[in-house]
Amino acid sequence: SAISPTVYTLNQNYRNTNEIVAFVSGVLDADMRPIGLHGEEVAVLTPRQVGAFFRGKQGLKAVIAKEEYLPLFEKRGFCVLKADGKISKTKVNVMSVFESKGLEFSAVAVYDKGMTENEKYIAYTRALRELAVISE
């Protein structure tokens, strides 16, 4: 007797706001369906505007970039992830896509230069409430 498997596609998104889901779906052609959480529109920033984006924001914050671009974000008030992997609750955490996998932050700014589609998906979807994309 032949086994006929049933394929289920899990595309309901319970993590990100409608705005983040719409952005990711549009940019990466990902089949994601929001559950109705409303938030801010996705922002586009220059590197100089990153500090202002995070100012006054509550919750965990992160800048996510490819490993080779992390030094661009070594500034006052930003905390580059150390080997111990400790996340700062007060500063802006700076980390690679790989380091961000499985984590969630209230606000995320992504410097997506050189990222693959998969890396962009991981980076963008770390943001629970607010996402910004850093472009030059």
Regions found by a protein language model. Name each.
Residues 1-136:
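Conserved helicase motor core of SF1/SF2 NTP-dependent helicases
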